[in-house]
From Swiss-Prot:
Compartment(s) of residence: Plastid, Chloroplast thylakoid membrane
Topology with respect to the bilayer: Peripheral membrane protein
Protein name as catalogued: Photosystem I assembly protein Ycf3
Family per similarity comment: Belongs to the Ycf3 family.
InterPro entries reported for this sequence: PSI_Ycf3_assembly, TPR-like_helical_dom_sf, TPR_rpt
GO annotation terms (biological process): photosynthesis
PROSITE patterns: TPR, TPR_REGION
Organism: Thalassiosira pseudonana (Marine diatom)
Amino acid sequence: MGVRNFIDRVFTVISDLILKLLPASKQEKQAFAYYKAGMAAQAEGDYAEALENYYESLYLDEDQYDRSYTLYNIGLIYAKNENYPRALEYYHQAVSLNSNLPQALNNIAAIYHRQGLLALEMASQDYDAEMEISEEYEYIELAKGLFDKAAEYWYQALKLAPDNYPRARNWLRITGRAKSLDSF
C-alpha cells in the first residue's frame, strides 16, 4: 500500500469518527460526505466526478470555513486543467471566506506569475510586421502588473506560512519585491 493510499484511508477513518462523535445535522453530514467523495475522485484523477461532488457539498454546506476548502479544491482542479481564470475565481472565493489559506494565496500568486511570464514571452517574440512597438510595451507593462500581483499574494502567503514557499521568497528577493520578508 502506498503512502498516499494509507493517508487517504486514515483520513477516511478519522473523518468518519469525527462525524459520529461531534454533533452535526444531517445536512452537514451529507455535505461532508460529498466533500470526501470529491476528494477521493480528485485523488483518482476523475475531475468531473470530483467537481460534481464538490458542487453538491457547496450547495449543502453553510460553514464558511468548510466551504473555503471546497472552493480551494475546485480551484485546484481548474488549475490542473489549465483553466486559470476559473482557478483564480475559486481561489479568490476561498480566500474571501478564509483569509488563513496560504496555499490558495500561493496558487493565486503562481498563476499571476505564470501569466506574467507569458506576457513577457509575447513581448519578446520575434517581431512580425504586424506587431508595433506600442504593443510590445503593453505586454511588458502587463507582465510588470502581473508580477506585482504575484508578489503581493506570495507576500501574504509567506506572512501566514513563513517557512513555506522558499522559491517564492527567493523570487521576491531577486526581483526586489521582498518588502520586509525577514520580519516573519
